[in-house]
From Swiss-Prot:
Keywords associated with the record: Isomerase
Pathway: Carbohydrate degradation; pentose phosphate pathway; D-ribose 5-phosphate from D-ribulose 5-phosphate (non-oxidative stage): step 1/1
GO BP of this protein: pentose-phosphate shunt, non-oxidative branch
Family statement drawn from the similarity comment of this UniProt entry: Belongs to the ribose 5-phosphate isomerase family.
The UniProt record lists the keyword Transferase: no
Role played: Catalyzes the reversible conversion of ribose-5-phosphate to ribulose 5-phosphate.
One function term, GO molecular function aspect: ribose-5-phosphate isomerase activity
Species per Swiss-Prot/TrEMBL record: Listeria monocytogenes serotype 4b (strain F2365)
The protein, known as: Ribose-5-phosphate isomerase A
UniProt-annotated binding residues for substrate: 26-29, 81-84, 94-97, 121
Domain of life, source organism: Bacteria
């Protein structure tokens, strides 16, 4: 069986050159990118990674990839990350893995952003996948009520154990469901006006190259 995630994840490593500062995303596809980069580092490649989550940091450290914090780099040459959905306007939803805030901060500091996906992630309109919003625990119910007044349904993210999911930053995540985000700019503005929302999973002006793996194993490169 063809592993589309592995194919896409490893393909993106072709953009990595010696001496680069590389943003390391979070998720099941970029997992394979990091595994491949670990091999390349062990074979002599010199890079510095900037991890977008504790999970990614642990994986990179186990593979021997040198890391620095975002505070300790002036800029990032390339960030490779996954996405939950991408539309035809290069707008995306990210944050299914809970790392949206750090992912967006790292993406903002990057000269180039590459997203690695399997073909089902390419959609006409955003919204089949829930839109995560990271909120501070204090008063999160007020945020939920504010959105309810706008007829926006949210679900508080929980772990499989039933406990509330807590991000690496100590926050909660509300997932917006049953919405289509055709006017993503409007949604971005709306969410930015609600106190207590730390960040949202709309990534509207970030990605430069999409590495998309097809079911037959072929790779499609989609560039802005």
């Amino acid at each position: 069986m063809i592993n589309q995630k592995k194919i896409a994840g490893e393909k993106a490593c072709e953009w990595i050159k010696d001496g680069m500062v590389v943003g390391l995303g979070t998720g099941s596809t970029v997992y394979y990118t990091i595994e491949k980069l670990g091999e390349m580092v062990n074979n002599g490649l010199h890079i510095t990674g900037v991890a977008t989550s504790e999970e990614t940091s642990k994986q990179a450290q186990n593979l021997g990839i040198p890391l620095k914090s975002l505070n300790d780099v002036a800029e990032i040459d390339i960030t490779i990350d996954g996405a939950d959905e991408i539309d035809t306007d290069f707008q995306g939803i990210k944050g299914g893995g809970g790392a949206l805030l750090r992912e967006k901060m790292v993406a903002s500091a990057s000269l180039k952003n590459i997203w690695v996906v399997s073909e089902e992630k390419l959609v006409r309109n955003l919204g089949k996948f829930p839109l995560p919003i990271e909120v501070i625990p204090f008063g999160w119910k007020q945020i939920e009520r504010t959105l309810e007044k706008e007829h926006i349904q949210t679900i508080l993210r929980r772990q499989s154990s039933g406990e509330i999911y807590v991000t690496n930053n100590g926050n909660y995540i509300l997932d917006i469901v049953n919405q289509t985000f055709r006017d993503a700019e409007m949604w971005q503005e709306k969410l930015a006006q609600i106190p207590g929302i730390v960040e949202h999973g709309l990534f509207l002006h970030y990605v430069d190259i999409i590495v998309c793996a097809k079911a037959n194993g072929e790779i499609e490169l989609i560039k802005k």
